[in-house]
Each structure stands twice: as C-alpha cells, then as structure tokens.
C-alpha cells in the first residue's frame, strides 16, 4: 500500500509529525534504524541504574501539552511532569556555589546571598531585556516555520523591524553578558547557555539571551519515569492514531523523480512509496547520503559530547538533579573545541542525577550519574580509539575530583561510555554533532535548514538539525512544522 507519508526516524520530531498528520487522516509509516523509538532520547540500564542517555531537561512544557492537545489528547493521561528546583546547581573551583531557581523571589534571594545585591539587580535587568527580545521574536523565530531573510519582509512580521536593534545580532553572546554583569562567575554562568545548542558564547550572537530567559521563565521539568517516558508517550499516541512503525529499518536512499520525493529505500533493499517524505534525520546526512548529493556543503557543526553513565554508591556529595562544575579556563575551553578541534583537558562538567527526583530510576541504594562534557565533532570515522577514550575518561574523573574529592572511590560499576563516534554511528549524526549546525555566526538563525526542502518537492525536514533547532521543545515544534508543510503541499 502506498503511504501518504513516510517518516525517516522515530525521534521526537518524527513522532510528533506522525501523530499530527495521523490525527488529520493521513496514513503514516515511520521507519526507524534502531529497535525502539526515541532517537537520541534513549534509556540505558547499567549497574542497577536507569539512565537517560540523551536529553536530560525539559523547558517550555506547554509545547509538549500543545502537541498532544492538537491531536485531541491530554498530556496528563500519558505523562506526569515534575518541576525541578533548583533548576541547576553551579560550582566553581574556588568553592563558590549557586542554586538557580525559577521562582523569582527565591532566585533574587539566592543571587543576593551569593553574589551581592548589585548582581541581583543586574540579573533582573538582563532578564527584562531578554524578555522583550523573546516576546518580540518568538512568533517569527520559534513558533512558526521560518524561510530565511525574506521572512522579515512579510507583512505579518513587519512589526518586528523596530525591535531589531534590541536583538543584538552583531554582538557576541559573551560580550553582551559581560556588558550586563560585573561578576565574572555570572558572566560564565550565562555564557554556558550557548551550549544548549552546541555553540560558543565567544562566537554566537547575543540573541541567545532568550535561552536563559526561557529556562528561568518556564522552569526546568522532568517526567516521572525518566526523560524516555516522553518518547514512550509519543509512541503510544502515534499507535492510538494508527501510525505504523517499522523498526530496524535503516533508510539508505530517498527516492526522487524529477526533483520530487517518491519514497525511500532501506539498506535491506525494501522500497516504500509515499506521496510525501519527512526526514527526521540529520539534514546534512539526508542531503549528502540519502539524496546522494556528494557535493553538499557541510555546515559548521555544533559540539558533540563525551558521556559517562556512572552507577555510584551512596556518597557524601549531596548532588542536585542538575549540577555544573565550571572550569577556570572557559574561553580556552571553547577555543580548544571550535578552533583547535580538540577535546579540552580542563573542562566544564555537567552531571545529572535523575534519581534525586525520581527514586524509581535506581535500585540497591545506588545513584545514577549522567556525566557530559562538550567535545568537538569528529572529522573522520573511528576517531575515538580505546586508548583515547580511556585517557579522556581519566581526565574527566580527575576534573570532577577537584570539586568532589575521592569521588572515584564511590563508583559502583565501570562507567558506560558514549563517544562522539557512537553518536555519529548510532544516529547518522554528522561528526557526532548533537545539534546539527552551530549558531556561531550572526546569521545562523536564518541559515538553519527549513522544514520544507527548497530543492526537492514533497520532502520535508524535522529534528534538532532543522528549524527551529535542538532541545526537546524545539524538536517537537519542528515536527509540527514538517506536518504543516505536508498539509500545505497536499
């Protein structure tokens, strides 16, 4: 049977596109390379612990609720979201610690206590500026498809033009942060938000100020049962609406005729015809490998990551759900990643211990430490040898022990390691990049691949490498926009 729509990849973007279309009567089949849905949102059981081995934080929960509501469902019947407070705990090597709260009263109190009244006032002024930018731009850049520079000149977007100077396109994110804050630790804390889409604060535009505003405004959330419960909820709703899933189906080619998508072929030789194809794959992979366009220009890629899933015995460290351990060499860290194309030896470390919020994730009095360090994307296959992996594991553990002395003595089982090579091979992510292209230019927001392919009719894109970008809420929106693109061209 010929499908109305074939979707490549059962990530969150692909599944949202599938359930939106199925709810409107389209016949949809999703082909997934792996044996389960979720894409990078996956779960690993290791050493008496469950780990979310991909995304670890939800912001803008209303996007999740809206996605289900648009199909006639109520999210609360599929998923229970828990607020995380503090959103994140920050530590520096000199012993300074700071809890970031979504509640403005608690945040003001903590900021004044740790950094002083002036810093509290600076933060409030910063967030007020970012709020204006977010509300001026959200309907153009986030909540609708975006088709490049020409979007500015559409009648509906003309009210944005007077606000353009406040967007600070020509300013670097770090420069903007340094103009607002006098305390270098707060500059570093806000600089870190550029890593939410895999970019450098020293290269990315100041428009990224909306990222901390969104987190502070809407809070941090976690679904009971782990982040993977989100993938399970989307999968369940898709099945209820009649979406067909075929797992262990690695798509090898998007079939075209006269520059029109006609279906796909998998590596085992099976052909699937469709009126429309949605690619939830990395956009560069889709163009270079699936469309066989050998001369596709590779974008500047976002960061990849080195992940360790560490089962820990009970310990005295009193970890929060989310913790960031800052290095003292932040600018050098990003120079090493983006200019030298090397993994930094003195690195900032992110640790998520979801068992702190959800005891169901651990057994036998263990703690589940998800440890992530930013790395450059790979430039060739099999770049992470066993020797290189072991050496970097040692470097990261040594760095953690500068904050948490003797931490390694509490490790209960050998860490489960995920390298940039693994991200590349498992998910066809170019160079193991976690977010597709970086935002390391003033025009990066306008150059992100569009949801409607500009060259191949009836081909559409969603996922973290397409508009509007990476992170759970934006990927959900990308699936919605891809579905809208199908409906607009049907």
Question: What does each of the following model-derived ranges do?
Answer:
Residues 55, 464-486:
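A conserved FAD-binding loop/helix module that cradles the flavin
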Residues 93-204:
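Rossmann-like flavin
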Residues 2-138:
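N-terminal glycine-rich phosphate/pyrophosphate-binding loop and immediately adjacent elements
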Residues 222, 252-363:
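Mid-domain catalytic core of redox enzymes
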Residues 164-173, 216-236, 384-392:
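Short beta-strand to alpha-helix junction loop
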Residues 314-418:
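C-terminal segments that line or cap access tunnels to active or ligand-binding sites in enzymes
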Residues 183-197, 346-350, 406-468:
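A glycine-rich dinucleotide-binding beta-alpha-beta segment and adjacent secondary-structure elements
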Residues 210-261:
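Helical element adjacent to the flavin cofactor pocket in flavoenzyme catalytic cores
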């Amino acid at each position: 049977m010929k499908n109305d729509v074939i979707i490549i990849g059962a990530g969150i973007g692909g599944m949202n596109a599938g359930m939106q279309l199925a709810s409107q009567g389209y016949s949809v089949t999703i082909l997934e390379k792996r044996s389960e849905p979720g894409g990078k949102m996956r779960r690993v059981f290791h050493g008496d612990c469950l780990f979310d081995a991909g995304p670890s934080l939800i912001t803008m929960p209303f996007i999740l609720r809206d996605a289900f509501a648009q199909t006639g469902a109520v999210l609360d019947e599929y998923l229970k979201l828990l607020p995380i407070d503090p959103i994140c705990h920050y530590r520096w090597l000199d012993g300074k610690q700071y809890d970031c709260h979504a509640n403005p009263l608690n945040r003001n109190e903590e900021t004044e206590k740790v950094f002083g009244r002036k810093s509290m006032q600076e933060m409030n002024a910063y967030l007020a500026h970012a709020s204006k930018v977010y509300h001026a731009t959200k309907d153009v850049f986030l909540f609708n498809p975006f088709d490049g520079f020409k979007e500015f000149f559409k009648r509906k977007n003309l009210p944005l033009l007077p606000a353009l100077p406040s967007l600070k396109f020509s300013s670097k994110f770090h420069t903007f942060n340094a103009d607002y804050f006098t305390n270098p630790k707060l500059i570093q804390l806000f600089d870190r938000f550029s890593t939410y889409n895999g970019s450098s604060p020293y290269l990315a535009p100041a428009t990224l100020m909306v990222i901390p505003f969104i987190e502070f405004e809407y809070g941090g959330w976690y679904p009971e049962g782990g982040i993977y419960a989100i993938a399970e909820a989307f999968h369940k709703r898709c099945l209820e609406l009649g979406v067909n899933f075929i797992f262990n189906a690695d798509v090898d080619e998007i079939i075209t005729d006269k520059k029109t998508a006609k279906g796909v072929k998998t590596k085992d030789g099976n052909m699937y015809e469709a009126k429309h194809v949605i690619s939830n794959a990395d956009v560069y992979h889709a163009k270079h490998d699936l469309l066989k366009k050998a001369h596709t220009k590779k974008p500047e890629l976002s960061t990849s990551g080195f992940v360790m899933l560490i089962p820990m015995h009970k310990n005295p460290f009193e970890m929060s759900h989310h913790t960031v351990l800052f290095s003292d060499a932040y600018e050098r860290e990003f120079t090493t990643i983006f200019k030298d194309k090397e993994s930094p030896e003195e690195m900032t470390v992110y640790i998520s211990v979801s068992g702190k919020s959800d005891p169901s994730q651990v057994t036998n009095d263990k703690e589940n430490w998800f440890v992530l360090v930013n790395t450059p994307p790979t430039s060739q296959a099999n770049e992470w040898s066993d020797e290189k992996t072991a050496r970097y594991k040692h470097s990261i553990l040594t760095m953690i022990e500068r904050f948490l002395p003797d931490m390694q003595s509490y490790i209960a089982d050998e860490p489960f390691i995920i390298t940039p090579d693994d991200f590349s091979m498992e998910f066809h992510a170019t160079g193991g990049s976690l977010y597709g292209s970086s935002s390391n230019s003033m025009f990066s927001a306008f150059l992100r691949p569009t949801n409607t392919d500009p060259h191949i009719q009836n081909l559409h894109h969603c996922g973290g490498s397409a508009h509007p970008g990476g992170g759970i809420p934006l990927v959900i929106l990308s699936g919605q926009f891809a579905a809208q693109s199908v409906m607009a061209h049907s």
